[in-house]
Structure formats: structure tokens, C-alpha cells
Amino acid sequence: MFVQKSIDLGHGRILSIETGKMAKQADGAAIVRLGDTMVLATVVSSKKTPPLGQDFFPLQVEYREKYSAAGRFPGGFFKREGRPSEKEILSARLIDRALRPLFPDGYYYETQIIISVISSDQVNDGDVLGGLAASAAIMVSDIPFQNPMSEVRVGRVNGLYIINPDVNELKESDIDMCIGGTNDTICMLEGEMNEISETEMLEAIQFGHTAIRKLCVLQQEVAAEVAKPKRLFVPTVIPTELDSFVRANCQSRLRELAYTPLGKEERAERTAAIYNETLAATLEHFRATISSEEAQADTAKALCLNEHIIEDQIHAVEKEVMRHMILDDAKRLDGRALDQVRPITIELGLIPRAHGSALFTRGETQALVTLTLGTQKDAQSVDNLTNSDDKRFYLHYNFPPFSVGECGRLGSIGRREIGHGNLAERSIKMVAPTEAEFPYTIRIVSDILESNGSSSMASVCGGTLALMDGGVPIRKPVSGIAMGLIKENDKYAVLSDILGNEDHLGDMDFKVSGTRDGITACQMDIKIDGLDYHIVENALEQARKGRLHILNEMEKAIPASRTDLATYAPRLTTIKIPSDCIGMVIGKGGETIRGITEETGAEINIADDGTVTIACTTKEGTDAALATIKSLTAKPEVGNIYVGKVRDVRDELGAFVEFLPKTDGLVHISEISSTRVAKVSDHLKVGDKVTVKLVDVRKDPRTGKTKFALSIKALEQPKQEGGEATQN
């Protein structure tokens, strides 16, 4: 059954949702169109019953942009799309984070959502359309789903908010924020801002939510016309006797442990001991009372003997204990107040060969951040359907397994690392200098050495400090903080600088970064329904206070960027040469420019407009490269003195001297010396270096070639009457 519905987003933007034409064998499929950008989303959920005791939802979200959608060919030898790009991974994460909380609790059936951009006008981005299409595909399927979810992008140009701004409007916008939500609540935020206030942030969220509500209604209308009944799903019900026995064995011990301020490692060891002892006692108890025949005949009794189910119940008790401790007594696992930030230590310049470095430690989270400065050649190439450019500021985030005391495989970078690095990069790039102010390519690398919550925000702080340590003239320092939330009915508590356990057992992870004057980036994931705006407002204000506290600590370590670059950082020198001289500097097959690099140790980049950038760690190398380039591009001028090399000797005519690269002139036999020269070879030989003066430039009327007349004699100092040379 084909159904199509559309809505006006404002400013003449018509968005449509259709289903029933494509991918009809999937459980659900929908196409969302805005302008000439079309996104197809499909969803399939396995009907195979998951194993008893499975405690996770195997949801896979894939977002792909096809070059054919814009009438383009992929790069590479095979001319075929390969592994997902960074943008595709980030877009998939946006959609996953918004959709995952909306599936029913206990729904553990393998589910795959594939979003494909099948048409692109290269103006309207497909990422937020993909989230809307994915939700619409689920809504028209038989998969159980709580509420429709919609994603929008909010921009602001000249003070006016815009829903789903195009790429040209985004260039002028001071806000680029993606919002995912249902009719009742916001469940996901991510974006970058140009130092906006908390009030402006809230306005942008509310503006976006108004559009989200309309899009959710549109999805419901489409789903109502399709009218596909939902498949039966009955969540696992935990037997009362199992819940009671587990509580009796571990609740008091977990409460006592929760009220004891401990480090992460010691708490984990004690918690594991309680888990193991409770699990053993529970299994022993129910194995004594339930026979194998009863377990096979009665699912409820089988649950009492399932180790995964028992561990889930212990975990539920642990979560309940911690949440009530925070809500009822305003106490946290490490003994801090709700709005208190962990102790901070900062060390700068630890890595001698890096161009800037910082070791930022906050509680049990530690980031070693290094800065590398390079040239335009080191910029990161970005090529997707809406953007083809070179990034000259980027941040890479690494999270090795030892940072949480675990063994793990090392290999390709995971989606989480890409996402965390992107958030930290967006946080800092708003204060990075422009290319005109600082013509370097800037790479920041954050290696997480310890982690107990908020490692991405540690990367923001460490990245800022590394830039300042390296002498990069940032506009203002940036800090970041992760906020948490515990909410039961109308009672709630907002937590500053959350621990890993508080993130895991809480209801919200809200990361906010910015300067003293405003927010530069944010990311929020909500695990509950019904998040009120006054809670977001309180969280933003509490985050502002925490952010300012961290900035104070950072400024104690380094109040401003250093005035000089690091010893081993390249020094950049820029000159402009005529465009028609570019080939002369590069040489045949790059021979000339390679020769300059080998001789001087300098790296040379030439732009199409003739701008030459010389990068070298030594002044001597820079000066040598600069002199060579100037000589290569110099124009011969009568009266100038040059040092040249004899290329050819004609005994009765004179000597040909290369006084500029690829430019020869003739020193006539009469211009070699003020005394009579009988034979040129008696005075000059091929390969000799000589100082000459350009005395004449003329065109050969027969050939049209320019000829240069040089003189050595003209440089001889005139003799005084006593025969002595004049001293200048």
C-alpha cells in the first residue's frame, strides 16, 4: 500500500514521507525527501527468539551515502564505495542514540536498520532525514516501538532560527545542533555553537522540539494508513521469589558499599565479590528447591536458575540503591556533593619532541594530549555529498583497553572513539585561529590513560591546554564537563562531573563545553521519557558553574598561550611569486622543488595563486630555501649584480654564464678584464663561479630571443692616480 504525506518546514521547505513503493520485503521501509535529497530507510528485526538470559539489544544502525546519489563517481581504483566514512559513522551514531531508548525494555531481538542516501542535491544533508526515515520505517513495520521519533537540525542565521538549514545557511549560522525527540520529550542532542548562552541553547531546543512534534504526527498519520498490526512481544517477568531472595542477600551489603567513598578499582573488586557470593547463594538455594524437570516445564522456575537473569537482578538492586542514595541523601559514590567537580591536576610540556602537550587528570580520568603543527599538505581531506574540503584543524581520540584495566584487541578505530573525538574537536575548533592568523595545520591527539567517566571532556580540557602550551593563539580557553541525572517520578538530582557508574546507572549523559562567554558544543543522551525543560535548564546552569570552575584551574596552570612556538615546531614563512613562475620553482617532474627540500631540509608548498609556504625547524634552512626560490623567480634587471656559474667558454668570443636559474648571459671577451684578454680559457673555465653585472638587455631582431650582456670588468674598482684601488 503506497502512502505519501508531506509537511511545510517553513521558508518553503517541503518535507515528505512515503512508504509502500520500495523495499517491500523488509519489515518496514520509508523514504524521506527534502528538496532533491531522498533517504531510504529499511528495518528488519529477527523473529528468532533470543537466547534465555541475553541482556543486551543487538541493534545495528548503518548510514550510507552513495556517490551515485549526486551523479558522482567514488574515488579509488575500484570506483566503488568502501568502508563507511567518518561522517557516515557519526550520522549512524546520531540515529542509533535517538532510537535505541524507544524500543521496549527487554526487547532483545536482533534488529538492523539501514539508511541509504539515494539522491542528493548536495545542499540538504541526509543525516537528520535518515533519523526521521528510520523511525518512519519502524512505525510502518510490525516491530514493537513506543513512540515515533523525529530528528531535525536547528540553525540560526541573523538571529532567526531555521529547521534543517541547508549547507549554505549553515556557513552563516552560529548554531548547528541536531535534536532527536518524541512528541513528549527530547532524547538526543548534539551540536556546535559559537559561544551561545544557556538561555539561547534552551530556546533552540524548544524551537526544534516544536518541529519534531509536527513530524511525529506526520509519521503517525502514515502509520495509521498502513495499519500494520504489531507483532506480539511479552517481556520477561522476573519471578517474585527470585527478586526477594536476591534482595535479601545483597541489598544491605550494596547499600553499605555505596555509602563508603572508594576508588574505582577497590569499589569494583568489592562489588564483584558481592555479585559472586549472591550468585552462588541464589543458585545453591534454587537448585535445592527446583528440579531439572520443573525447570524444563516452567519458564519462571528456569529463570531462577539462569545466571544471567540472577546477575541482572543484582544489577537492578545495585542501581536502585545508588539512585536512592543520591535522591534521598544527596550523597554520591565517591562522597562528593551533587555539584562538586573532582580534583584536577595539570602538567604541561611533558613530551619533549611534541609541539605542545598536556597531562590533564580529573579524579580517576586522565588524558595525555599532544599537539602537532604542520603545513597545508598535512590537512585532512574531506569528501562527502555535501562537503569537499581540507580540514586544517582536527582532533583524534584514542581509548586503549588498559585505561579501564582490561585486556582488549587493538586495531581499527571504533565508532565510540570517532564520536568522542568529533565532539572534542567541535568543542575547541570554535576558538581556533583562522588560517590568516595562524597558517598551520593543527592536529591534536588525546590518549586516554585512565577512565572513570567524562574522558571526552578531559580531551577538551587537555586539547585546549596543549594548544596553549604549543603557542597556538586561540581566542579563549575551552573546558568541558559531563552532567548526569537521576529521576524518579517528580524527584530528580542533577550531577556534575559524573563517574562511570553514575553514567551507567543514571538517566542522562549531558556533555557541555564552552568558554567563559558561552557554549561551544554539547551532546546529550536521555534514557527516560518525560524530560522537563526546567531540568535541562537546571543542568545547563549547573554545567556553566562547573565549566567555569575547571577554567579557573586551567588558567592557574597557563593563563594564556605561550608567545613562542615549541623548539621542534616548524616555522612557516610565506612569500608570493608570479603564477607563471610556479613551474620554474617546481621543475620538471618536481625535480627543482625536491632538490631545494633535500638541500635545505625545508618543506615547500605552492598554492595555485603563487603563494609559497616554507616550513622548516631551523632558520638557516628557511633562509636557504627562501634565497633559492627568490633567485628562481627573480627577473633580470640592468645594473644588478649576480653570482653565476660558467656554462660554456668560447676563446675568441667570451663566456656564457648562468646568472639566474635557466637564464644565461654572455660575458664578452672585452668585458672579462680591464687588461687585454687574448684567450678566454686562460681566465675562465666551465664550472667556475663568477660575480657579474648585467649591463644590457636586448632582443635579437632575427630570432626574437632576449639576450643578456654581462660584465666582470664593470665590477673592477677604479684605480686612483697612485695606482691604489678605491676602498668603499
UniProtKB/Swiss-Prot annotation:
Domain KH: 570-629
CC cofactor: Mg(2+)
Location within or outside the cell: Cytoplasm
Gene Ontology molecular function, alphabetical: 3'-5'-RNA exonuclease activity; magnesium ion binding; polyribonucleotide nucleotidyltransferase activity; RNA binding
Main localization, broad class: cytoplasm
Protein family membership: Belongs to the polyribonucleotide nucleotidyltransferase family.
Keyword entries, A-Z: Cytoplasm, Magnesium, Metal-binding, Nucleotidyltransferase, RNA-binding, Transferase
Source organism per UniProt: Chlorobium chlorochromatii (strain CaD3)
Domain S1 motif positions: 639-713
Name of protein: Polyribonucleotide nucleotidyltransferase
